[in-house]
Amino acid sequence: MNGRFAVPTAIEPACAALALALACATLGAQTPVVQSDQRLRSSVEVTVVTATVRDAEGKLAVGLPREAFEMFEDGKPVAITQFTSERVPLGLGLLLDISESMYGRKIKDAENAVERFLLNLLAPTDAFFVMAFNHQPRLLFGWKTDPAGVHESLGRLYPTGSTAIYDAIGAAIPYLDRRPRERAALVLITDGADTASDITLHDLRPALVRSDAFVYAIAIDTPGTQAIAQKVSVPTLSEITNQSGGRTEVVRDTADLETATANIADELNHQYVLGYSSPTPGDGQYHSIRVRVSRDGYKVRARAGYVAARRNDSR
């Protein structure tokens, strides 16, 4: 395949074995943040779920008490043993498509949106990493909390090559698993369909199910997309994002990328984190999860299920 781009650190293309083995608006100074010693992470004993709640008007619902929530595993109610509506520190991964079809204004608008997201819309307590991808994913920088080098790294990108979305997600998930913060989210920005991955969506699904990260996609679906790219597949992106509790947002103009990333940041800034003790801990099996608000008109997005870690699992 033609084309490479110069960045400091490279990641080999994701492969099926990897995938199968892996299974905000700007923050105000008054925003409460959960202290770093509060560990809100899943373990063999406790399953932790992050949830986004919207009211009947579609607005983010904030300030709901624990008593307003109900949780179910495999259709059976479970008692909520951990709960916070305060902002829990976030580990964010960002995947930026730099295939040939992103040339020109698209890549410039995308770079500006990414830079604003990372430098202005995250909290000082958050950490982030960025991968760029065409027919293979490349790590621009690993986990960091400071803005140093972000602008320069993005500015060196040059769109070329084809699009390997599944490989990029497969390469990002291990970083999310080793995140230095409690919550996890992955944001994908792309203007095309996958044309070059070594793995398939089928190969990627086990890794997505095992991950507790909210996955978001911003699909650039501009009129008259160049013939060099297959049109972005919104249904495929939605299949990837929806099961995680995330979503896919479509923009018709790259000038709207900043609004789209701000909407995602706003969600990440107003989430609930809930935990419960599974009735069947450590069995290594898949279990469905449902989170609901007992009051009328509220809609909850959370991951659809999880694979329980075995008690002898060393991960």
For the regions a language model picked out, list residue spans one by one.
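N-terminal secretory signal peptides that target proteins for export/translocation
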Residues: 1-11
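Compositionally biased regions
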Residues: 3, 16-17, 29, 43
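Bacterial N-terminal signal peptides
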Residues: 12-28
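Scaffold/interface architecture of coatomer-like assemblies
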Residues: 27-315
